Design a protein with these regions (language model features):
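Short, intrinsically disordered, charge-biased short linear motifs at domain edges
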Residues: 13-15, 36-37
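Calycin-type beta-barrel ligand-binding domains and close structural analogs
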Residues: 29-45, 53-161
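N-terminal secretory signal peptides that target proteins for export/translocation
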Residues: 1-10
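C-terminal motif of bacterial Sec signal peptides marking the signal peptidase cleavage site
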Residues: 24-27
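Hydrophobic membrane-insertion alpha-helices, especially the h-region
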Residues: 15-21
Length: 161
């Protein structure tokens, strides 16, 4: 496994996969995505099957179209896309199995060898309730990009071969 110093931000697909895993641990809480549309296209190195470092969680990341990923995690389906803000690789992840279809926000890091993906969800306690639309959320994330409380615990996945 590459040390964290050699990890680079790459491939939202992995971010999406991570987002899905994080969603299983914390519910989707936001009415709107970070950005109203994707900020980049699907990246092939993010597609595939991922397994958590402890071997207990499995995630499948597939391409729906040029910009959207579909993630299958623990029996649930999620729709995800890149929502980069302030040079940070965010993804907007929508729970498509629930009636309210709310979003979660996740930051991802892909190792240089593209075999390891690290995900961190945005801490829902940090974003004020009045940040109700995509442009307000994106501005808030940009202004708070260096806030150490912005992101929650990291989860690591390894690509299945």
């Amino acid at each position: 496994m590459a040390p964290s110093s050699t990890l680079i931000y790459r491939g939202a697909g992995f971010g999406i996969a991570v987002s899905l895993c994080i969603l299983a641990f914390s519910a989707c809480e936001y009415e709107d995505p970070i950005t109203s549309s994707p900020t980049r296209k699907v990246q092939e190195q993010l597609l595939g099957n991922w397994i958590s470092q402890d071997g207990k969680e499995h995630m499948r990341v597939r391409q729906l179209d040029d910009n959207i990923y579909i993630v299958y995690y623990d029996g649930d389906l999620f729709r995800a896309y890149h929502s980069d803000v302030a040079d940070t690789p965010f993804v907007s992840v929508q729970d498509i199995n629930s009636d309210d279809r709310k979003y979660a926000y996740v930051v991802w890091k892909l190792s240089e060898d593209t075999k390891h993906l690290r995900l961190r969800s945005v801490n829902h306690d940090v974003i004020p309730n009045e940040k109700k639309n995509s442009s307000a959320i994106a501005r808030f994330l940009e202004e708070n990009a260096t806030n150490p409380d912005l992101l929650g615990e990291e989860i690591q996945f390894n690509k299945e071969t």
